[in-house]
Amino acid sequence: MLFSSLATALALASSATAIPTFALEVRQATTLNAAMVARGRGYIGTSLTIRSDNSEQNLIKGAEFGSITPENAMKWDATEPNRGSFSWSGADQIANFATQNGKQMRCHTLVWYSQLPSWVNQINNNATLMSVMTNHIQQVMGRYKGKCTHWDVVNEALNEDGTYRDNVFLRVIGEQYLPISFRIAAAADPAAKLYYNDYNLEYGDAKHQGALRIVKLVQSWGVKIDGVGLQGHLVTEKTGTQSTPTPSVDVLTKVLQDYADLGVDSAYTEVDIRMNTPSTADKLKVQAAAYARVAQSCMNVARCVGITLWGVSDKYSWVPQTFSGEGAALLWDNNYAKKPAYQSFLDVLNGKNATMT
């Protein structure tokens, strides 16, 4: 009888210890955004262009993404092609899509040298450009006030060596256009998180130092800047357009921590990790490790609030048209099949081990 009772007790104890393990497995998120939110972060997002082919929109409507960024529809050439004459149709479409599908909207971008109408580039008077810049920021942010959780206020203001990129705003207004832009934006929508956004910050070199100086400059004016966006247009291997593959977890983490040390958040804002095409099984494994490094670096720094992918499927990626002979940069292939990088990315977000080299 004693043996029977002991056996029963041991069996019950064994069952009791098995329950938490089972529950832990059940709690593992099965979608990217759910995994990110479960880690106490803000979102996994994607860029969006509304197309007649609904494949991407239908996938975005699901649970994989919690945030969307207008790929082109909120840029200056799309919203104010002629001075004082605003066009909202494309941006409204995306804002409505976000609202209807319960997505955050990370809005992009207000002051940028590219996709800028020629009439802006032709301005050579300080007062005129100040008026134009102020009105543009106020009108665009005002229309989407309360709908944009984050704004890329200034985009790509730096050269690779960390100096200021030549553009009409720098030539006519001077470096103060940076804090002035943030001051106007903060007044236009006080609730929105305001970011400086750029590419090639991830390597921790001179350009990253330039971004740190921009944060300090804006802060020195007593103006709000909430974060730095690292675009994350990276490569798996040396390509014709980029010689340095995606950095190590340690390098990426240090870069993000540098921003946190200045009291601002960070986010990966336009991630795609391209390779020399065509892709192979081995190249896809290398890509999976690179995506894992990006995700892990964000998990390592509490002030990294989110990761946005620059597209869903390779089918519509901007990469092949921009970088000849390169592509296969996203988590879904041309046929919307998940690539190995999807699983490694999800595993890291779920706190699981993933190969990172």
Predicted stretch roles:
Residues K61-S67, N126-L129, Q139-T149, V215-G227, ...:
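Structural recognition of alpha->loop->beta junctions
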Residues L48-E64, S131-V140, A206-V218, L252, ...:
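Short, acidic/polar
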Residues S87-S89, Q93-Q104, V172-L194, G204-S279, ...:
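Glycoside hydrolase catalytic-domain groove-lining segments
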Residues T46-N58, W76-S89, L158-T163, L201-G210, ...:
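Acidic-and-aromatic substrate-binding clefts and catalytic sites of carbohydrate-active enzymes
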Residues N33, A63-P81, S89-L201, V264, ...:
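Substrate-binding cleft and catalytic face of glycoside hydrolase catalytic domains
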Residues V26-A34, E80, S118-I123, Q139, ...:
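Aromatic-rich peripheral "rim/lid" segments of glycoside hydrolase catalytic domains that contact
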Residues M1-R27:
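Fungal secretory targeting signals
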Residues L24-A73:
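Boundary/entry segment of secreted carbohydrate-active catalytic domains
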